[in-house]
């Protein structure tokens, strides 16, 4: 029996006090498992507000970059919605693919779609979201 490769992922969140960040990260972990990701680590930073360029601060981003190298991470999953520039900035800094919570959920739907119409609808939703 062939063993399925799990994508090695680090979960990242910024706790601004707006919601229960720990519960949200637990839910993100379950979503990641459903999508076929192996959680290597969680990084949760308490912040007054999101850093506009990267969501998390410069020092925490450097810590994430180190974790990526030492743990062999292939994916960073953020527990919030990211802009295209935030994704690019974090990817440029870490050399690791970055997705957000919504992209993760759309990936789960894409993996479960069976009919041609269902697959096209999910693909359309993914493309619209990435715009």
Predicted segments — roles?
Residues 93, 104-131:
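Extended, highly charged alpha-helical segments
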Residues 1-107:
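N-terminal accessory targeting/assembly segments
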């Amino acid at each position: 029996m062939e063993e399925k490769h799990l994508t090695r992922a680090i979960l990242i969140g910024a706790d601004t006090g707006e919601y229960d960040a720990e519960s949200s990260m637990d839910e993100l972990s379950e979503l990641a498992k459903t999508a076929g990701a192996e959680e290597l680590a969680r990084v949760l930073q308490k912040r007054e507000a999101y850093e506009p360029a990267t969501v998390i601060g410069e020092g925490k981003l450097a810590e994430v970059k180190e974790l990526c190298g030492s743990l062999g991470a292939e994916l960073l999953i953020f527990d919030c919605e990211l802009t295209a520039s935030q994704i690019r900035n974090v990817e440029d800094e870490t050399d690791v693919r970055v997705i957000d919570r919504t992209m993760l959920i759309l990936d789960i739907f894409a993996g479960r779609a069976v009919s041609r119409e269902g697959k096209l609808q999910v693909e359309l939703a993914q493309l619209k979201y990435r715009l």
